Amino acid sequence: MNDTTQATDAAHAHSTHQHSMQALAIAAIGVVFGDIGTSPLYSLKEAFSPAHGIPLTESSILGVISLLFWAIVLVVGIKYLLFVMRADNNGEGGVLALMALSLRPLDSKTRVAGALMALGIFGACMFYGDAVITPAISVMSAVEGLEIATPHLSHLVLPITIVILIALFWIQRHGTAMVGKLFGPIMVLWFVAIAALGVYHISRVPGIVAAINPYYAASFMADHLLQAYVVLGSVVLVLTGAEALYADMGHFGAKPIRLAAYGLVMPSLVLNYFGQGALLMQNPKAIENPFFLMAPEWALLPLVVLSTVATVIASQAVISGAYSLTSQAIQLGYVPRMKVLHTSELAIGQIYVPVVNWLLLAVILCIVIGFKSSDNLAAAYGIAVTATMVITTVLAAVVMVRVWNWNRLLVGAIIAVFLAVDLGFFGANLLKVAQGGWLPLGIGALLFFLLMTWYKGRHIVKERTAADGIPLEPFLQGLLAHPPHRVSGTAIYLTGNDKLVPVSLLHNLKHNKVLHERTIFLTFVTRDIPYVRDDKRLSSRDAGGGLYIVKAEYGFNETPDVKAVLEEFGRTHDMTFELMDTSFFLARETVVPTHLPGMSIWRERVFAWMHQNAAKPTDFFSIPANRVVELGTKIEI
């Protein structure tokens, strides 16, 4: 009886685990695979663009489909799903998390560490270059289905695209938790639909299945040489969104993402691309829009609607990714403080960054109006994706060797294959710089300059502050030996360095000549891991006389919370804190550019402007504005 009960419990636990895994996989399909899942809308059409001069013969169709197939297998199926997703930072993926992991065993002052940091930041910047193109090309290519379904409405493609995009960004501030539950089932329907379309056309031209043989890809490259290399720049469009598999790993876990990819997403994509190839072999004129021309006439409008919804979901994933990346970059010190709002009390990862939201919308609308069609925009797409892919491969190699201590020869062999593929795609996309590739490169380069300027500027400010600083604990001992007038209440001094006296305390003593009976020096520190356990978050030192030095550690995926820190500190020290009875003292730094060693004067002016426009600490740390005392200080850099 006991054995039977144990067996039943084990079976129940296994069933529950399987159900949970399937639920996570469906949720992942709605968030992770939107971008790569909507690539069939434009990828094959762009590969046979008239500008490439590739004839629509049977051999070239088989060759291009073979290239698409092996690109998906090698980059998505093997590189990302089997190798890169192993390189997680405490479960978190993405280029910044990977950069933080690769830097962990290195001295931050070495050139290697500096180069890896610059690579990681550039990869993050290129993500933003991708983030402004994905919503534009995805939504536009879906709405362009109207040109096939109802040609007399073709003049409405641009206005409808603009309205959809404005609506999408407008609802961001309200959060997407409610509609987000529908994303998974809708995208499952999308993948089933595109797979069914593919199967129908493959059944009519079974010969297309021969494209599985890599001989056709190699033969196509050999026959067309330079033209074929140019086509590689379009083939990479089937991989847009592959980085999301890794970047969103922290939300869903590696197993559900792999289950979704191998179980539904990759088979559906392959079937659809092969179906489009079969259609072209039967009717080369279908190159006008092979995706929508796969559908029977009665299904065209429903397919346009479904594809539009799917592209909105894909865009949502990119937008959410931009918020998350910005939040990580703020915590790691690469971006000025910005207002970050949490749109859900239950889901930690659901945030909204107003500045990023409206900047993205402004740039995306300019792109849509400027490029006018998905065909024109396709040339701009790909270069940001491939640049990030190359950077991810390099950082993953460093992690394999330096963090995991894998055999260098083994890592070299694996990475050589991946880099050969990545650099091949990247080189092919460099050929498209003049046609539109300049756009993501320009956006990425501008952001890289701003982020590196901010990081360097903050480093200089810290050096200047440390050089002029006074050690905190000896100062406090002297203060207690000759105390100023003590006043009732609690004072909290926010400081960036728990070893030095806050400038705000010096100013308060100089001008007001008082010290509160309970004084706390609070420092927030961001670790190179995504989350810090609650029991490891706080450390404190009692300096005596009601003076406490408190350090709160957060991961780069977390947002510092003053109220929560005070509550936790109060619990461990048998104290109570009322925010409205507490005074917060902050130093308001004014950065003054000078000719001192550091950065060139014009970069210092850019940094000073960024510093001046960063979100106020009161907004960022959610401190009641009427409880804050700001004391000004000038820092020459």
Curated annotation (Swiss-Prot):
It holds the Pfam family K_trans. It catalyses: K(+)(in) + H(+)(in) = K(+)(out) + H(+)(out). One of its GO terms (cellular component) is plasma membrane. Keywords: Cell inner membrane, Cell membrane, Ion transport, Membrane, Potassium, Potassium transport, Symport, Transmembrane, Transmembrane helix, Transport. Transport of potassium into the cell. Likely operates as a K(+):H(+) symporter. Belongs to the HAK/KUP transporter (TC 2.A.72) family. This is Probable potassium transport system protein Kup. It comes from Burkholderia vietnamiensis (strain G4 / LMG 22486).
